[in-house]
Swiss-Prot record:
One of its GO terms (molecular function) is phosphofructokinase activity. InterPro entries: Carboh/pur_kinase_PfkB_CS, LacC, PfkB_dom, Ribokinase-like, Tagatose/fructose_Pkinase. It catalyses: D-tagatofuranose 6-phosphate + ATP = D-tagatofuranose 1,6-bisphosphate + ADP + H(+). It comes from Staphylococcus epidermidis (strain ATCC 12228 / FDA PCI 1200). The keyword Transferase applies. HAMAP family: LacC (MF_01557). Keywords: ATP-binding, Kinase, Lactose metabolism, Nucleotide-binding, Transferase. This is Tagatose-6-phosphate kinase.
Length: 310
């Protein structure tokens, strides 16, 4: 089973407007309201592909209940941990080709809740083969909280994928508890190394071979329309992808993570895993809905992706 963790979920609300006017009333004719969070995008895509997946994380208040109800309608298994605080809203105003976001700070997790959640995870880990950790940490959690989860998972023989950035990722990288997979994009890779990394193959090889990445089995770097670059143990790969009509790229990284998790749980070859991961990401970008793929198009896209050992 694949377990996805979304520790700072949200109710995502989008308001499309022809024009956004300040200091006056703006009326919208339609509203989109969904259960949001990077891990939930991963969950939905895995479920659509037919994988055995369960979603967990922190939920609280009326908005937390709304997320639970939304997930129930999709028949996805869930095992969220209830907190005293209120799950947050994230509002996007879509106007004139631009996007203005209003992000609530979200709940503060109490110390007791953070410790009880680890016990909650240990129960879930009994049936877990791959654990996916996605997104930011909510307030109240130590910046090394992901490090604790990776350690607990590794003790149970579970493969781990960490898709985060900033200090929460850095804390894991400087620890002795390394995840199986990380998936930075080129900008996040540059931030981690404190220098600008380009798409040049030699530069990428040198970048992912830095000591900070020691003992991480898979490093998969997204290169946007140029595909991806990957290091698996001592092998390096360049992934070339076909041109597609991009409808909505939001959630493509999460869909790529879903493909990685699927590849790991089925023990697929390096080539198969990388092709599946990139196919999932592309299929998401071809759809309007975030965290959604058209599985009927999977084989067509999969066959067009090229993986070259470099």
């Amino acid at each position: 089973m694949i377990l996805t963790l979304t520790l700072n979920p949200s109710v995502d609300i989008s308001y499309p407007l022809d024009q956004f006017n300040l200091d006056t009333v703006n009326r919208v004719s339609q509203t989109s309201k969904t259960a949001g969070g990077k891990g939930l995008n991963v969950t939905r895509v895995l479920s659509e592909f037919g994988e055995d997946v369960i979603a967990s994380g922190f939920l609280g208040g009326a908005l937390g209940q709304y997320i639970e109800e939304q997930i129930e309608t999709t028949r996805i298994k869930q095992a969220f941990f209830k907190i005293k605080g209120e799950t947050r809203n994230c509002i996007a105003i879509l106007h004139e080709g631009q996007q203005t976001e209003i992000l609530e700070k979200g709940p503060t997790i109490e110390l007791k809740e953070s410790e009880e959640f680890k016990s909650h995870l240990l129960k879930l880990f009994k049936e877990t083969d791959v654990a996916v950790m996605s997104g930011s940490l909510p307030k109240g959690l130590n910046t090394d909280y992901y490090t604790d989860i990776v350690r607990l998972a590794k003790e149970q023989g579970i493969l781990t994928i960490l898709d985060s950035s900033g200090q929460s990722l850095e804390e894991v990288l400087i620890s002795n508890e390394k995840p199986t997979v990380i998936k930075p994009n080129i900008d996040e890779l540059s931030q981690l190394l404190n220098y600008k990394v380009t798409n040049d193959i030699k530069e990428l090889k040198a970048a992912v071979s830095q000591p900070i990445f020691n003992d991480i089995e898979w490093i998969i770097v997204s290169l946007g329309s140029e595909g991806a670059f990957a290091k698996h143990n001592q092998k390096f790969y360049k992934v070339n992808i076909p041109n597609i009509k991009v409808v909505n790229p939001v959630g493509s990284g999460d869909s790529t993570v879903a493909g990685i998790a699927s590849g790991l749980i089925h023990q697929q070859t390096d080539e198969e895993l990388l092709k599946k991961a990139n196919a999932f990401g592309m299929l998401n970008a071809m759809e309007q809905q975030t965290g959604h793929i058209n599985t009927d198009k999977f084989d067509e896209i999969f066959k067009q992706i090229e993986v070259i050992e470099v």
